Swiss-Prot record:
Subunit structure: Part of the 50S ribosomal subunit. Contacts protein L20.
BP GO terms, sorted: translation
Protein name: Large ribosomal subunit protein bL21
A Pfam family of this chain: Ribosomal_L21p
Similarity comment text for this entry: Belongs to the bacterial ribosomal protein bL21 family.
Highest taxon of the lineage: Bacteria
Known function: This protein binds to 23S rRNA in the presence of protein L20.
Alphabetical keyword list: Ribonucleoprotein, Ribosomal protein, RNA-binding, rRNA-binding
Protein's organism: Campylobacter lari (strain RM2100 / D67 / ATCC BAA-1060)
Gene responsible for this protein: rplU
InterPro entries tied to this protein: bL21-like, bL21-like_sf, Ribosomal_bL21, Ribosomal_bL21_CS
UniProt-listed HAMAP family: Ribosomal_bL21
UniProt cross-references to PANTHER family, sorted A to Z: 50S RIBOSOMAL PROTEIN L21, LARGE RIBOSOMAL SUBUNIT PROTEIN BL21M
MF annotations from Gene Ontology: rRNA binding; structural constituent of ribosome
Amino acid sequence: MYAIIKHSGKQYRVSQGDELKLDRFEAEVKSSVEVSEVLAVCDKELKVGAPFVAGAKVVLEVIAHGKDKKVVIYKKRRRKDSKLKRGFRRQFTRVRVVDIKA
């Protein structure tokens, strides 16, 4: 059984027991979060929502919060002695899929 969920404008295919990194959201570590924006559920047959499947929920357990590796953005304009170097670290929340209710 798997489900396709929408979170922070992105779509994820999840199964029970999967771990994934979502964009950071406010939740306590080891707490449960329910996602009701389920686009599709497959349990022997595929149910596709319009836009969401009615009554379907995915229960997530928050494992940890953290930051990704730094991404360096470097811009240089030739012959103008103009350059720009910036860094960015995306914050994420690591979650585990506990249950899929369809």
